[in-house]
A protein has these predicted regions:
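Class I (Rossmann-like) S-adenosyl-L-methionine-dependent methyltransferase catalytic domain
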Residues: 1-37, 51-86, 92-98, 139-231
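Conserved class I S-adenosyl-L-methionine
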Residues: 41-50
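Conserved acidic residues
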Residues: 42, 63, 105
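A conserved beta-strand element that flanks and buttresses the S-adenosyl-L-methionine
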Residues: 108
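Short catalytic micro-motifs in class I SAM-dependent methyltransferases
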Residues: 111-112
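Helix-capping/helix-break motifs at membrane-protein junctions
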Residues: 117-118
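A short glycine-rich, Lys/Arg-flanked "PGG" loop and its adjoining helix->strand segment in the class I
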Residues: 122-134
Length: 231
């Protein structure tokens, strides 16, 4: 991840239009992740987890949950928020690299690939292949395809907002976004996008048997999710 994106996520931002938006966003992700946990004693890694407000729901279904976040301020917040949950540990990316081989049952990379260079994503896939057990699962979700633009994302947010009681805040938030640091960064740096064929090829090159999932994790079904198992 470029230093500009890391600084953005480590600072104060308005990517969520309201507290309600942030809450239902993370709740939806946690519910989907919990459903993917294969067994009660599973070791799970959420890589690039953000604030993960409802990570306790995932941990309740697992034996251990590692929350990996590169932004130091966010990582400190995670450690404080879940300090009393013995199943949850906030870790830095370099700590993940030191984990034992074949020690994880589930790895989730949600809404991260668009902020990484292709070679960074390839390196992560190789790392996850090393860390996953032979029957483990990698989930790469919220992947942007080349044809999904900002208008599609905005429409998905408005539908999500209307269904969850923050529509007016979403309209105002979208207007603010056009003047925000996020939009300036997105316009300057762009977002990394993958066709289905491209992401499947990248996963296969890292040693996985990948497939496109029927449904994306999160509210935006114009984006895609992929399941991959080590071969």
């Amino acid at each position: 991840m470029t230093s500009a994106w890391l600084a953005f996520w480590n600072g104060s931002h308005s990517i969520y239009v309201s507290a309600r938006h942030k809450d239902v966003h993370y709740r939806l992700i946690a519910k989907a992740m919990a459903a993917l946990v294969p067994r009660p004693h599973a070791r799970v890694l959420d890589y690039g987890c953000g604030e993960a407000l409802h990570a306790d729901a995932v941990a309740a279904a697992a034996g251990e949950l590692l929350l990996c976040e590169a932004a130091p301020r966010v990582r400190a917040g995670l450690a404080a928020r879940f300090a009393n949950d013995p199943k949850i540990r906030a870790v830095a990316p370099e700590e993940v690299e030191r984990l034992p081989d074949h020690s994880l049952d589930l790895v989730v990379l949600h809404s991260v690939a668009q902020y990484l260079k292709p070679e960074e994503t390839a390196a992560l896939f190789a790392l996850f292949h090393r860390l996953l057990k032979s029957d483990g699962l990698l989930v790469v979700s919220d992947v942007l395809s080349p044809h999904v633009g900002a208008a599609t994302d905005a429409a998905a947010l408005l539908r999500f907002a209307a269904a969850n009681g923050f529509f007016i805040a979403a309209v105002a938030g979208l207007a603010r976004t056009l003047l925000s640091d996020y939009w300036r960064l997105r316009s300057r740096l762009g977002l990394t996008r993958y066709s289905e064929a491209a992401i499947l090829e990248k996963l296969a090159a890292a040693g996985f048997n990948p497939q496109c999932a029927d449904k994306n994790i999160g509210h935006n079904q114009a984006r895609a999710a992929y399941y991959a198992r080590p071969r």
